Amino acid sequence: MLAWRVARGAWGSLRVAVRPPGARLGRGGSRRALLPPAACCLGCLAERWRLRPAAFALRLPGTSPRTHCSGAGKAAPEPAAGGDAAAQAPSARWVRASATSSYENPWTIPNLLSMTRIGLAPVLGYLILEEDFNVALGVFALAGLTDLLDGFIARNWANQKSALGSALDPLADKVLISILYISLTYADLIPVPLTYMIISRDVMLIAAVFYVRYRTLPTPRTLAKYFNPCYATARLKPTFISKVNTAVQLILVAASLAAPVFNYADSIYLQILWCCTAFTTAASAYSYYHYGRKTVQVIKGK
């Protein structure tokens, strides 16, 4: 009986110690305040499960919740001088600063527009294979509009710019261009060697992006952290000739789509555009080979 009373008293003291001042653990009350914030995506959920002690630790009095993707919330208070410094040390929260400060919100308007462009790519490929070039021209114009909008929004609104967007925007362009060139080559509107050159360059660039992601990821490197879109490690900056090359490639796509509609598939100007596209593609590949390291900006503190 005495042992039971001692155990009950110790449990009551422990509950009071972890309870914020003035809070009562009633039904649906401050218990919810002690829970960690909800994960915004599957990547955050997987990373939080890997770091369970940090994700499910109780918040200390005087601190506010910190969302993983936006990095919002106030930092922990500075430890007081003297004997209280050890009690207020950051290690009491079980949170790794490098893990929480690396997160950003991936759900921005430019990123959604880039994903929309990726979704339109197979639709365009199907329309070209079905030789429905009139509708394909309209869908291609819509895809081009999303490309213009995401760049305009990211440049003019700072909260819409993200490290993920710096990689997702060119990736969407490469997916769209690759599917369009393969489909147009199948329809005998673009020569095979030109398509092979463009696809080879894009495959090498995509492989380089995955390699940069691996190299800039802090240890320990895990699959959950690698494929987490909220975890930003580097920003990619395309070269000037690469931007020119993308514009020339899209002009060739538009001209090739319109060729069957306006009956100029055998025009000499279209063949000149083939040569210009081949030149800019080769020059773009060389620019990335020569200035490769300058196109990658590693985010500080990662």
Swiss-Prot record:
The keyword Lipid biosynthesis applies. Residues 71-84 have a biased composition (Low complexity). GO terms for molecular function: cardiolipin synthase (CMP-forming). One of its GO terms (biological process) is response to thyroxine. The chain crosses the membrane at residues 109-129, 133-153, 190-212, 250-270, 271-289. GO terms for cellular component: mitochondrial inner membrane; mitochondrial membrane; mitochondrion. It comes from Rattus norvegicus (Rat). Its main location: mitochondrion. Catalyzes the synthesis of cardiolipin (CL) (diphosphatidylglycerol) by specifically transferring a phosphatidyl group from CDP-diacylglycerol to phosphatidylglycerol (PG). CL is a key phospholipid in mitochondrial membranes and plays important roles in maintaining the functional integrity and dynamics of mitochondria under both optimal and stress conditions. It is found in: Mitochondrion inner membrane. This is Cardiolipin synthase (CMP-forming). Its EC number is 2.7.8.41. Keywords: Lipid biosynthesis, Lipid metabolism, Membrane, Mitochondrion, Mitochondrion inner membrane, Phospholipid biosynthesis, Phospholipid metabolism, Transferase, Transmembrane, Transmembrane helix. Belongs to the CDP-alcohol phosphatidyltransferase class-I family.
